[in-house]
Amino acid sequence: MDGSTGEFDGRKDWGVVQASHGEGRGPGVNFASMEYDFRAIEAKWQRTWQDRGAYKVQEDPSRPKYYVLDMFPYPSGAGLHVGHPLGYIASDVHARYKRHKGYNVLHPMGYDSFGLPAEQYAIQTGQHPAITTDQNIQRYRGQLEQLGFCFDWSREVRTSDPSYYKWTQWIFGELFESWYDTQAQTARPIAELEDAFADNGNFNVHAACDEGWWKHLTFPHFGPHFDGSFTATDWQSMSEIHRSEVLMAFRIAYLADSEVNWCPALGTVLANDEVKDGLSERGGHPVVKKTMRQWMMRITAYADRLLESLDGLDWTDSVKDAQRHWIGRSEGASVRFAMADASGEPDGSGEEVEVFTTRPDTLHGVSFMVLAPEHPLVGKFTSEAQRKDVEAYKESAAGKSERDRQGDKTISGVFTGGHVRHPLTKKAVPVWIADYVLAGYGTGAIMAVPSGDERDWRFARHFDLPIPNIFEGVDLSDAACTDKKAILAHCGDWSGLTAEEAIPKALDWIEAQDCGTRTVNHRIRDAVFSRQRYWGEPFPIMYEGGMAHRITDTTVTLPKVDAYLPTEDGEPPLARAKREDWPVWRGEAMETNTMPGWAGSSWYFLRYMDPHNETEFCAREKSDYWGQVDLYIGGAEHTTGHLLYSRFWTKFLFDRGHIGFDEPFKGMINQGMILGRSSFVYRIQGTSKFVTHSQRKAHNTQRLHVDIHLVDNDRLDLDGFRQWRPEFANAEFLLEDNGTYLCGHEVEKMSKSNYNVHSPDDLVERYGADTLRCYEMFLGPLTQHKPWDTQGISGVHNFLRKTQRMYTQAAAHEGGLPATSSEEALRTVHKAIAKVTDDLDRHAFNTVVSALMIAVNDLSAGNDPLGKDALQPLAILLSPYAPHLAEELWQSTAGEGSVMDATWPKAQAAFLVADQITYPVSFNGKVRFKMELAATLKPAEVEAIVREDERTAAQLDGKSIRKVIVVPGRIVNVVM
């Protein structure tokens, strides 16, 4: 080890250990008498690795790189349970394997340390979230270190550390200072857009922007008939604040009024997936719809690129399909319907409703229109007679999340009293509102074709609305016709055509009549980037003269506040801070929202490459060397949000020339969950009386989770339960006949909220980290869900103990450890090398453990002494799974340096050829016995031996042999 750098060269520095403590021996170890003292072994090697900086890594252009990354954890107060390390163990196995294969491996770890749980605790206790977060991180770090992971801890990052979020703020600032060129398909500096406006206005500018952005301007500069086009003279005549407002509509990070899920109890905006049945998933608090001024991210500009580059990624089809569904690209037409009176004549307002449809060929079948309750034109359509009903319905819809509205099959809606003019028939089309139409998808309005859409058909039947039949020979009495091969009827020139034939004609007609355009629509919406929370990244934004300005000269850190709740006016917690409470203050006011939880996690994989750089987020030469993450391992719950945002930010940074690749994760594995066995008690509704499991159906009961540590073989510790839940200290329990209370049970997700978690700490203390590592891999395929069961862990522990004993006996051989082993032993080892290598290349982590068990059993059963040529390769094979024990075994064989730096062994073909083959011998297709024969025998020789075997004569029972079929190396079939 170089004392000045702390870097470690395993091959060079481990010789110091050997020289100091005896050739071929670890520090002070007598292998001849050693048992498997896993506590001493693991403590020793963890200390050795740490002292020597064994896992520190630097760029090395002479070696190929490999980047293995885990989805970093949120450090909760509960610490790790046994489900958390599953992916970490798999990534560690793979990282060690690649190191053995000669790669320069980057394998870092950090913490996604901003988050709501720490803030909720701060609200309850008044303790600053930074304190609890740091305490939780220390606990996580200790748990991770005891498992022997090869993380380069010198690269640790924390998203809540100002030295980290300084660069999150910088990336946001770059997004704020950029626009998206839809023609060149790239992000460009906003200054270039300003220059273009100054030279030519916005003519020939191809920029992603807010739809109808000019309708939202707060200044009357252009007049009521402005269509969004302006000249250079117009631009130059604008004031600075007016230019700022126009530019905001084109920035990639921008301010806009947005309808959000607002949770008053939590005091923040929630994402759609954080709301269920109108309640927050965390805490079950009511959630309502609310329009707020929010920071947004123009991810929609990247929608097509996010779709197109999926094909080049080594991800599962299910993950790619989830991304495609979330982005939701569809081709069709935008059609405009003019506001009209009840006779279909334009009402003179000039207002139009734009709808998107993928089936413009069904335009003849439109019999009503449905708007989302939040659509901005609802108020203008609503008649006085309908206003009360419309307002009541809007209020009801505001209490539902988009997910609830999409999943609710109940039919509901209200007629507004207004109409639009049908562009084809010129007739009046009634306008309704219904919560199955979402403001955030498409235009927030649909043209309803009940003959061709099942949802529209049910709505029309429920409210007795017309269902014009536009299909030839189709009965609509029971359902709509959704067959795209159906023939159109009563559709003018489109009659007699299928959808495929009619859609191009419909698109041509719509554009010729100037009532719409060909359009590509995406389900994905621009992402809300504001949160009304304290514990998040503050924005590097100040306000002056009514305009938002980027702060570039310093990091904006969180101010002191007197409470972590929103203000009485509903302002974010940061609004509580006075000017003197802010470490940094610029302008007239500071932005008081904070960034969402996904901000810091959208680029952390880049910071690992250069974590201590104070002048840039990552030096280009470092990102060029490490490049994309080669293998990313994490839960499937992140297959949409996190991956989309990370891909979006990566493409943006690529566009602006900061990195040389536009996809962050080349390969990815989503590990399955380790499931826990939950226990339940049954309370009679509205009482403090509990009934045992067998009596639960005789009463109206509520099932409650109970801590599994209070349950033994389904029997509940009643005293322990009363102490755990003091509110039930005086509860009555109706017991089984034998006086026990039996709980119910169910296998489900292991989580703190289900009270079914098992700590890895207890298992490490009892069996050791190597045993836990091997056991979690042994449970089953990494990608599958698996119930947690410790019944098999002792078997894995015994396997490691047996391995240790085998090496101990070999080291105690008279005359020392032989250099060579028997041919039989080498066959066993090289068969294991071939199997383990193939399994690791296929990420079949579980079957490696089985292969190693078989090898150790076969080697232990042999009578010949084992030598270095068998034991050293076996120690290397074991190293990714049981690194502590493998180091010990490697030292016992006088291995050079550290086992982790040993070259991965190659299976020698000569030892993979079997010298004996087991032939099943069948008679007329039925196997009757087996024969062990030399692998070198020719088919004719095999046939002769079978014919002469006395068991063949017994099977013939006097019959003659018609022929003998020998499949070399496989089977013999005697045909009688």
Q: Language-model segments: what does each one mean?
A:
Residues D2-G3, D13-K65, P360, A372-H375, ...:
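Basic, alpha-helical terminal appendages of large translation-related enzymes
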Residues F31-L69, R99-P108, T132-Q138, G312-W315, ...:
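Conserved oxyanion/phosphate-binding beta-strand-loop segments in alpha/beta enzyme cores
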Residues Y36, R329-S334, E472-D508, A512-T519, ...:
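Long, charged, mostly alpha-helical binding arms that flank functional sites
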Residues Q183, A187-R188, A249, Y254-N261, ...:
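Helix-rich, typically C-terminal accessory recognition domains appended to large enzymatic cores
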Residues M296-S330, A372-V414, T557-W582, L874-T903:
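Amphipathic alpha-helical
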